[in-house]
Structures are given as C-alpha cells and as structure tokens.
Amino acid sequence: QMCIRDRGSHEFYMGYAVKNGIMATLDMGHFHPTEETYDKISAMLLFTPEILLHVSRPVRWDSDHVVILNDSVQMLAQEIVWADALNKVNIGLDYFDASINRIGAYVIGSRATQKAFLQALLSPIKQLRDYESSGRFFQRLALLEESKSMPWAAVYDYFCLKNNAPAAEDYIATIEQYEKEVTSKR
C-alpha cells in the first residue's frame, strides 16, 4: 500500500492520506517538541484502517536517532496495546546515529521497543478499565502506579533466553565480538 510521510503540516498529510486511501506515516521526530505522537494514534485510526509509525528519539529539529526506552516510546506502545490496535499499526524503527556502532544502535532500539510493548502487554488493562468504568478512579490510579514497578525486566530476560538471545546487558559483548571479527574487516 502506498504511504505518505508527514514532513510538514500533520493535518494536511492526514487529510490527504484519508482522502486518497493511502497510509499516513507518523514520524516521532517531526512534530513540535510539545506534541506527542502517541496522542494522535487513536484519533487517526478512526479515519484510516492502518498507520505507519517511524519510531525514533528526536534530537529536536536536527534528526532522528536511536530509539531508547523513554516515556514517549512507552506511551506509544501503551496507546497501541490499550487501543487494541496492534494489527492496525505498522512500526519502523530509526537506528541512525553516526557516532555509535550501527548494529549496537539497531539492537538498542529493537530491545527498547520490545520492552515498551512488553510493559504495555503485561499491564492489568482489564482491571484498569473495570475501575474506570465503575468510577473508581482512586483504585485505577493506584493500580496504574503499582503496575509501573512490575518485574517486566525479568520477563524480558526470560524471553531473550528462551529465544537464544543475550539477556540484560550481555548483548554488549556479543556486539563487540561481532565488530572485532566481522565489521572491522570490511
């Protein structure tokens, strides 16, 4: 499917995409510093069957760089999962940063994104919704706060080990070895 990338007026590109039946791209690096991409997902999905996200860590008005596990990426994953939109959102990661190893940058970004989605998927969504729909906002907020300290990192390490991938920071040595044995000889 054809896609249009947002590099100017978001409203113009969104309208153009909807009018012409093409997928719009939301680029995390191309919005005003006070705007958050995750705030736009649910609204856009009311008018278009799917969207493409360019996930990055914006360096304000400069360029996009390696994705890290920051609030924006966590909220992005949470919005997609909580809106039950995993099958409607296509995700591309930015891993460019000329100052660091590109394989390392790619791995950092991929793992950060996986961790954000894992956190969102492990959230007690049903209970949070039940509290909200019954007007029990204290309970909802308390559970939301408690869910922030769930042991999701242990779950992620287990996921890595089950898939023969290095857990925790063990990937650093693997990338250093690959750099020494392969990429340094190019």
Question: What annotation goes with each model-predicted range?
Answer:
Residues 2-4:
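Short, small-residue-biased leader/transition segments that mark boundaries at the very start
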Residues 14-26, 32-186:
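Histidine-acidic metal/acid-base catalytic patches
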